[in-house]
Amino acid sequence: MPARHRDVLASSCEGRLTVTRHPDGCLLVYPRPAWESRRQHIAQLPYAARALQRLLLGSAVDIELDSAGRILIGSELRAAAGLERDVMLLGMGAHLELWDAARLAEHERQALANGLPESAADFTF
């Protein structure tokens, strides 16, 4: 875990995290208190969202930063996200995304080729 994230996580949630799958093919890493709030919201989704509930809730695993600031991701989650040697950790506000570097590059290439979604039409840089 990079120092800038490790220090915040150690102070905000005592290094207690929850990791789960994301439909885009990465892993979501939440501070445990933020995950508990998110988990309740996911559990209340309508029946039509059962597949998403299974993905997010059924894959969720509680982990902790070790004394060296590392996290151990189990083989099932590593395989689901295609995590190989090179990984990228992206800060996304209240959570982090953990990507296989090659998968992220391809995902970004496709997203840029498709252009901004209509919902971001008013966004300016």
Regions inferred by a protein language model and the residue ranges of each:
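A short beta-strand-loop micro-motif that forms or neighbors metal/cofactor-
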Residues: S11-C26, G82-W99, L116
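Conserved "turn/edge" positions that cap or connect secondary-structure elements
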Residues: L116, A120-F125
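Positively charged
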Residues: C26-P33, E97-P117
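Acidic (E/D-rich), amphipathic helical modules within compact regulatory domains
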Residues: M1-Q40
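Short, solvent-exposed interaction modules
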Residues: S37, A43-R78
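Short, structured motif recognition centered on aromatic/hydrophobic residues
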Residues: M1, V29-Y30, G69-I73, L77, ...
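A short, polar/proline- and glycine-enriched secondary-structure boundary/capping micro-motif
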Residues: S11, R39-I42, L83-E84, E108-A111
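Short, surface-exposed beta-strand-loop junctions and turns on beta-sheet-rich folds
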Residues: D7, W35-S37, A79-A80, L104-E106
